């Protein structure tokens, strides 16, 4: 039997189902990696998407503020200390799925481009439960073209970055 994961929109989803992110990482690692995903939320952040996603010098303006707010909003619901596996004072990483479309698949210039980054690199300090959140990734909920859930592609891509994996395609624009 499959482990029950969550119920969304009246439909049950299973972590280990064929086509799941878990299955992708498990199969890609020949059974060496079996990730655990804890789903929390949804929460509503304080500003409109354009505050976080508007383009400034070809980059999103404030996605890190969205990530910090999301962490603060779920702080009472979860114990962030359990996500610091090496006890170095930092949450290993988090992944935020934001509502709506992403700029990478056709959303307008005020939406967020899915990415991975570090809060501290952006000058943002986020401490929850005595641990710092730094490394994160985020991606959109809906695909602009199909108007359906995005599936696992972008999630797996950005999640791979927080695991330390590089892009395997040209990233310099040449």
Describe the function of each predicted region:
Residues 1-174:
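Active-site-proximal segment of zinc-dependent metalloprotease catalytic domains
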């Amino acid at each position: 039997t499959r482990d029950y994961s969550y119920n969304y929109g009246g439909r049950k989803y299973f972590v280990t189902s064929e086509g799941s992110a878990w299955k992708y990482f498990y199969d890609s690692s020949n059974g060496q990696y079996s990730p655990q995903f804890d789903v929390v939320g949804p929460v509503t952040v304080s500003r409109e998407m354009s505050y976080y996603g508007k383009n400034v010098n070809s980059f999103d303006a404030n996605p890190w503020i969205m990530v910090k707010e999301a962490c603060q909003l779920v702080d009472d619901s979860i114990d962030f200390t359990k996500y610091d596996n090496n006890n170095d004072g930092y949450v290993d990483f988090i992944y935020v799925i934001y509502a709506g479309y992403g700029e990478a698949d056709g959303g307008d210039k005020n939406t967020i481009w899915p990415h991975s980054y570090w809060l501290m690199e952006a000058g943002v300090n986020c401490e929850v439960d005595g641990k710092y959140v730094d490394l994160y990734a985020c991606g959109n909920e809906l695909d602009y073209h199909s108007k359906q859930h995005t599936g696992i592609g972008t999630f797996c891509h950005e999640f791979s970055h927080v695991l330390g994996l590089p892009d395997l395609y040209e990233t310099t624009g040449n």
